């Protein structure tokens, strides 16, 4: 898509060369063929070192652009970014893609729908009522139970188990907000990657990323009714007990243990080998690995136990 076409859709002028762009990405990860954006002055240094050649920016950041950049000056970059994501959004069904392929020894129930462009490996089992969207990859020896929904572009590794009712790749919950209180959808143009030997319990929901990938890494086990929001990165061999929720763009290191009904805020970084007791409320990043935590606000588990003793004695 030409930058001039994007500018026309946004009803804003563009400056510089009229570049051909194939997608969007966040500033730190953007490539020369991608449109990116900088919402405020906080991103001035990232802007100067960006590999992208096309930008949505506020006027005060023009001086920070790399040489020979093309750009659109936006009164509200957040709104313009949301509007631009719609232009790069892929259709859920693409008839022009080649027919799906199914590996040797796989058993696909007659009540399963598999869209074009999808590749299913060997010895895969897909049970009745499942839906697999366009351009997905399902690894060898994976089992998909009834009524699982897998949206387009999802990649699932080998020897995974996906239990009934799971939804993988639905849109992340992302909106930009106008001054008038309207909510402008940020189209989620990334995907979900499930690495090898992952088990996902019944009725879990794992949202697709805005631009790149939501990742569940090798060997991780999810209990039932768990929500993983867009852009999350869940470290390998982690365990999540039922009814846990992880906010967008939060990253957990390997071998974390998260007990039931715990919740994580967005944009956190959690150190490897961290353990959280039931109903933990995690609102800040954790840098030290191997810690055990409880409560809300979150605290060291031993401290939390001492606090519970003191609370129990308040009426004495």
UniProtKB/Swiss-Prot annotation:
EC top class named in words: transferase
Record's keyword annotation contains Metal-binding: no
Biological pathway: Bacterial outer membrane biogenesis; LPS lipid A biosynthesis
Recorded catalytic activity of this chain's protein: a UDP-3-O-[(3R)-3-hydroxyacyl]-alpha-D-glucosamine + a (3R)-hydroxyacyl-[ACP] = a UDP-2-N,3-O-bis[(3R)-3-hydroxyacyl]-alpha-D-glucosamine + holo-[ACP] + H(+)
Residue pairs linked by disulfide bridges in the UniProt entry: none
InterPro entries referenced in this protein's UniProt entry, alphabetically: Hexapep, LpxD, Trimer_LpxA-like_sf, UDP_GlcNAc_AcTrfase_non-rep
Pfam families: Hexapep (PF00132), LpxD (PF04613)
One Gene Ontology term from the biological process aspect of the record: lipid A biosynthetic process
The keyword Lipid biosynthesis is annotated on this UniProt entry: yes
Top-level division of the source organism's lineage: Bacteria
Residues annotated as catalytic: 230
Recorded family membership: Belongs to the transferase hexapeptide repeat family. LpxD subfamily.
Subunit structure: Homotrimer.
NCBIfam families listed in its UniProt record: lipid_A_lpxD (TIGR01853), PRK00892.1 (NF002060)
UniProt function note: Catalyzes the N-acylation of UDP-3-O-acylglucosamine using 3-hydroxyacyl-ACP as the acyl donor. Is involved in the biosynthesis of lipid A, a phosphorylated glycolipid that anchors the lipopolysaccharide to the outer membrane of the cell.
Protein name, per record: UDP-3-O-acylglucosamine N-acyltransferase 2
Species the sequence originates in: Sulfurimonas denitrificans (strain ATCC 33889 / DSM 1251)
